[in-house]
Amino acid sequence: VGIKSLSGGYALHQVVLVRTLIATTFLLTLMVPFNGGLKVLRTKCLKMHICRGLCVVFANMFFFLALAALPLADAVAVFFVSPLLITVFSVVFLRDHVGPYRWAAIAVGLFGVIVIVRPGTSAFQLASLLPLFAATGYAMLHILTRKIGGTESAITMAIYIQLTFMVVCILMGLFMGDGRYSGSDDPSREFLFRAWIWPKPDNLAVFI
């Protein structure tokens, strides 16, 4: 709800960066000192951490873009396909076994998403695909977590996610933070390309 309220006046990378800075501050002050200090950054799975971070960035940003254009209920309903995708991806990437009843449940769930998105009808809008993309990124995050969860701590994985968010948001700010690509009537596109502005006092609480 907070993200949706901010999507009409602020840039996506600005909103995400502020959230990231708050989360990183929390981790560095309240979590890292009690979990070995900066030793938590040591890892043998750096590439996997980067991939996980990019999956989260992909998932969050596409979902936030969906919130700018769709009713909250519709965006959340489509995003709920993520558990189904996790199951499918676990078969493909982790060789998990899924029984026929679970496959039937997946088919019913995917049919429900098709009913909501309504492809091929006049009611269809491209923004309906954004939460589906977000769900895909979220599902891949969980697959990668399964792969490294046995050797990497939760705090290490959390920190690398925030670092990835920070890098991506800063790069977005450098390349389009001046609003050079803004001016679209599409709310999702405008949220993505809007210029960085200083938050209004009454919006600071929502950012935090």
Name each model feature, range by range.
Residues 9-57, 137-141, 161-177:
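Transmembrane alpha-helices of multi-pass small-molecule transport proteins
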Residues 82-104:
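C-terminal transmembrane-helix exit sites in multi-pass transporters
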Residues 101-118, 134:
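Hydrophobic transmembrane alpha-helices of multi-pass small-molecule transport proteins
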Residues 38-62, 126-132, 182-208:
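Loop-to-transmembrane-helix transition segments
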Residues 65-70, 117-126:
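Membrane-interface helix caps and helix-loop-helix hairpins in membrane proteins
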Residues 1-5, 12, 27, 123-188, ...:
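Transmembrane alpha-helical segments that form core, pore/gating elements
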Residues 20-24, 80-84, 106-109, 113, ...:
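Residue-level recognition of pore/gate-forming positions within transmembrane alpha-helices
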Residues 8-14, 62-78, 153-155:
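Structural motif at transmembrane-helix junctions in multi-pass transporters
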